């Protein structure tokens, strides 16, 4: 969960700061994966909190307790609305291979982005008065 100081952060990043504006310095566990805010919101059908909930479900499903530490916490500058996937879940997604988990998540984010673009292209323009 959300913590301050020299403690490490995993999970949803709640912030009044807009997404895509990396202004939140923090440390994350080595081997973590950060899902960008726009993709989090897309997974929640435009609702970031719903996106957090959806991601948390599969992060818990793939969490692998056999994973051992990948190294020292890594300093990052994050944005509100992003989601830090813990290395234990990245490892589980990769069937026991952290690098494979990162590759799978890279592809997943890329596909989400493409799907989001297609969805936006299909939407009618805003109504005018």
What role is predicted for each listed range?
Residues 1-129:
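Gly/Thr/Ser/Pro-rich low-complexity intrinsically disordered regions
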């Amino acid at each position: 969960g959300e913590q301050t100081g020299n403690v490490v952060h995993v999970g949803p990043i709640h912030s009044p700061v807009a997404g895509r504006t990396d202004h939140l310095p923090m440390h994350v566990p080595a081997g973590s994966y950060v899902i960008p805010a726009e993709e989090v919101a897309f997974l929640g059908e435009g609702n970031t909190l719903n996106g957090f909930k959806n991601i948390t479900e599969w992060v818990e499903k793939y969490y692998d307790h056999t994973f051992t530490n990948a190294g020292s916490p890594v300093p990052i500058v994050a944005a509100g609305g992003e989601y830090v996937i813990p290395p234990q879940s990245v490892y589980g997604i990769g069937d026991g291979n952290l690098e494979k988990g990162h590759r799978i998540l890279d592809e997943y984010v890329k596909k989400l982005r493409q799907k989001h673009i297609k969805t936006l292209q299909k939407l009618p323009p805003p109504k005018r008065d």
